[in-house]
């Protein structure tokens, strides 16, 4: 039995692939791309929310938002560690993102214009992320699957916090309800785009599904998200900006309108509303934080030398 046949056998049996196991080079590269982009999304995702920490309406909301952004930093570090088990360095992954050679989730290139946007990001954006990530808890690569289990627990808490913030606005004044509706109108379609292109236009899906890196297609996950979310929109007394949305009585699924893939393609090509601003902020943080990384490394080397002596 060749190494490749043994690998395929393990995938078929749903036995986790671990870092020291043999794996095809293309499998390793696919994982580095996916986990790296996932990590970048957590790190860049801190920016739109960080924008409101100093302007949160109450001390309680500020404490919640601080904790949430801190969680996202932790998720990013966790995922970079998972990627490093595949033999790449996080510095290289980060540099590729800064150079535009690796992507992050398109949703984070939209601005947060009001406090309602923060609630809607927690509810809709983290809600979409959870649909994606719960499926990844059974992905074929062990370190990635285990990272996802921890991250999903925290993300589901973020989503409940987001919905609670939206509920407070939905029960508030007319101006607050209008602010919430406006945020939903702006984030609904970008949230649906988070699942990636339609299955017939997704270049990496078939390979990823054959290797069980992905267990469900983009369109399946998008449908699941819509089915989960529309009843929540109704509880809030809000609507989504889709005149084609309707419940299909025979299937029990919601039918929704066509997504503007032109907007998605422009955003992932680096021409979205905030792409330039997001990368500039990350580049500045990377350069200004260099002394911290150098100091931590020097300290670790000193400790190591002391322990060796």
What is the predicted function of each stretch?
Residues 27-38, 56-75, 118, 143-155, ...:
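Alpha-helical scaffold segments that form or flank carboxylate-/histidine-based iron centers
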Residues 108-161:
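Internal, conserved structured core segments that host functional sites
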């Amino acid at each position: 039995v060749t190494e490749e046949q043994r690998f395929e056998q393990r995938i078929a049996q749903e036995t986790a692939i671990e870092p020291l196991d043999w794996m095809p080079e293309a499998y390793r590269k696919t994982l580095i791309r996916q986990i790296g982009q996932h990590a970048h999304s957590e790190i860049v995702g801190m920016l739109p929310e960080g924008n409101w920490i100093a302007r949160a309406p109450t001390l309680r909301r500020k404490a919640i938002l601080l904790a949430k952004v801190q969680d996202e930093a932790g998720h990013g570090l966790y995922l970079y560690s998972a990627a490093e088990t595949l033999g790449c360095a996080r510095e290289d992954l980060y540099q590729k993102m800064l150079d535009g050679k690796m992507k992050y989730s398109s949703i984070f290139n939209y601005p947060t214009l009001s406090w309602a946007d923060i609630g809607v990001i927690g509810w809709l954006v983290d809600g979409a992320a959870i649909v994606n990530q719960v499926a990844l808890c059974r992905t074929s690569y062990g370190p990635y699957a285990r990272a996802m289990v921890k991250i999903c627990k925290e993300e589901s808490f973020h989503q409940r916090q987001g919905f609670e913030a939206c509920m407070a606005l939905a029960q508030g004044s007319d101006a607050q309800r209008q602010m919430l509706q406006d945020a939903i109108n702006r984030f609904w379609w970008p949230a649906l785009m988070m699942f990636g292109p339609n299955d017939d236009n997704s270049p990496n899906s078939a390979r990823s599904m054959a290797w069980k890196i992905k267990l469900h297609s983009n369109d399946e996950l998008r449908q699941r998200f819509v089915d989960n979310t529309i009843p929540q929109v109704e509880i809030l007394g809000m609507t989504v900006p889709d005149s084609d949305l309707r419940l299909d009585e025979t299937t029990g699924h919601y039918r929704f309108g066509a997504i503007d893939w032109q907007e998605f393609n422009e955003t992932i090509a680096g021409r979205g509303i905030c792409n330039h601003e997001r990368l500039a902020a990350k580049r500045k943080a990377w350069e200004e934080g260099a002394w911290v990384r150098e100091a931590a490394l020097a300290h670790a080397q000193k400790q190591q030398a002391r322990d060796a002596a």
